[in-house]
């Protein structure tokens, strides 16, 4: 890693992952389009294959110089020991789970986890003989009662990307350590800038780099960051699955890192300004965003996080589903889409009840997930203002 500790975070991001030994070079790293690495001697070839999982040029699937730059940059920013890039966030989740779990094992999974993570445990892991217990994301020390003799890991997502519950990560890590359990967290919402998993003792951090890291909705990319203990098994799992990212996606990931700080500042600023306006509206029942004092998770967020991203939710007062759809169809700046983290603002009707096993999600008027993009906040508010009365049949 580079010795950039004397700099502030914005400068560290620009310098992250770079090999600055060369006197003359382009400011941007090249795109390496190649599958085969050639060697001049048998000794070089054998040495390369022996270390193929450890950021060594051996074969295209194991990475290129730009892949290694991306991985080193993310590890530096997030504070992990090492990172491995994957073809998507889902690939990162699968590779992590399969690296840690085997037939007969048991995992504790937060009930606020991403839907695909839930599906993986209910289908892929179940078919492999691995059992899952979902736990309430607001659980405290009571999680000890869910730990079995064959429990191997606790999977966290703080906050969840539909209902935004903040988990007490330090407490859960302490309990996990006492029981020799691996801790895995989905840190996509927190990003490497706003939440530092390894400072809090997490073993493995996963992110859908497709979202804030890439930041422009033009690449699919995932990344797994680890401590030293789990680096080797995570790398081998990801590489053996063949979940390698394409060279253009890696390039776009590196580009995204360089502007991550300034983009997140705008996302957070816009989200907070929109939320302050939404607080004044009689159509809104509750705002789901841990960075506001009214939220039940604010105390933990304020203690553990360094900022908040642009994704939040709102629950509506009782209204007709047809009116919700009518309002969404008329919005001009908020488009409907399943992803988030790009420059564009998005809005999506969601039903968290479909993704709950441990407790019910009872909200009469429906729930909307909103991503505040990089547009002017006043324009975004006006777009909502011009159409929100539809929810009251006006």
Annotate each predicted stretch with a short phrase:
Residues 1-64, 72, 368:
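N-terminal "arm"/small-domain region of PLP-dependent enzymes with the aminotransferase-like
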Residues 2-4, 13-22, 83-283, 288:
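Conserved PLP-enzyme active-site core in the AAT-like
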Residues 18-20, 33-40, 211, 259, ...:
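Glycine-rich beta-alpha junction loops
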Residues 41-91, 116-123:
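Conserved N-terminal alpha-helix of the aminotransferase class I/II PLP-enzyme fold
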Residues 54-56, 219, 307-311, 365-369:
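Short, solvent-exposed beta-strand edge segments and adjacent coil->beta transition regions
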Residues 122-123, 131-133, 144, 318, ...:
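PLP-dependent enzyme catalytic core of the Aspartate aminotransferase-like
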Residues 253-262, 310-318, 368-373:
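Short, well-ordered beta-strand elements within core beta-sheets of diverse protein domains
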Residues 272-332, 336-341, 352-362, 392:
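Conserved small-domain helix->loop->beta segment predominantly found in fold-type I
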């Amino acid at each position: 890693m580079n010795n950039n500790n004397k700099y502030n975070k914005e400068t560290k991001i620009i310098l992250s992952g770079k090999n600055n030994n060369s006197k003359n070079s382009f400011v941007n790293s090249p795109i390496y389009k190649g599958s085969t690495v050639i060697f001049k001697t048998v000794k070089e070839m054998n040495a390369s294959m022996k270390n193929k999982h450890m950021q060594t040029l051996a074969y295209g699937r194991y990475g290129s110089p730009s892949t290694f730059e991306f991985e080193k940059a993310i590890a530096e920013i997030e504070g992990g020991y090492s990172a491995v890039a994957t073809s998507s966030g889902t690939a990162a989740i699968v590779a992590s789970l399969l690296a840690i779990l085997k037939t007969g094992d048991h995992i504790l999974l937060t009930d606020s986890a991403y839907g695909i993570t839930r599906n993986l445990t209910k289908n892929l892991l179940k078919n492999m003989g691995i059992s899952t217990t979902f736990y309430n994301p607001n659980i405290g020390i009571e999680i000890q009662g869910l730990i079995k003799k064959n429990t191997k890991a606790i999977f966290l997502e703080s906050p969840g990307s539909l209902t935004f519950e903040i988990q007490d990560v330090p407490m859960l890590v302490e309990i996990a350590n006492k029981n020799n359990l691996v801790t895995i967290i989905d840190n996509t919402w927190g990003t490497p800038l706003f939440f530092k998993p390894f400072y809090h003792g997490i073993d493995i951090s996963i992110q859908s780099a497709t979202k804030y890291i890439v930041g422009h909705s033009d690449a699919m990319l995932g990344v797994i960051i680890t401590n030293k203990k789990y680096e080797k098994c995570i790398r081998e799992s990801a590489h053996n699955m063949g979940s390698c990212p394409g060279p253009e996606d890696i390039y776009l990931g590196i580009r995204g890192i360089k502007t991550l700080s300034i983009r997140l500042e705008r996302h957070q600023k816009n989200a907070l300004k929109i939320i302050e306006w939404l607080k004044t509206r009689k159509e809104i029942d509750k705002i789901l965003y841990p960075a506001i004092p009214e939220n039940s998770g604010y105390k933990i967020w304020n203690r553990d996080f360094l900022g908040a991203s642009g994704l939040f939710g709102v629950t509506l007062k009782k209204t007709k589903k047809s009116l919700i759809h009518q309002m969404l169809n008329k919005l001009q700046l908020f488009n409907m889409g399943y992803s988030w983290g790009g420059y564009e603002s998005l809005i999506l009707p969601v039903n968290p009840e479909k993704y709950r096993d441990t407790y019910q999600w009872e909200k009469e008027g429906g729930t909307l997930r909103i991503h505040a993009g990089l547009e002017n906040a006043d324009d975004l508010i006006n777009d909502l203002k011009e159409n929100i009365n539809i929810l009251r049949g006006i």
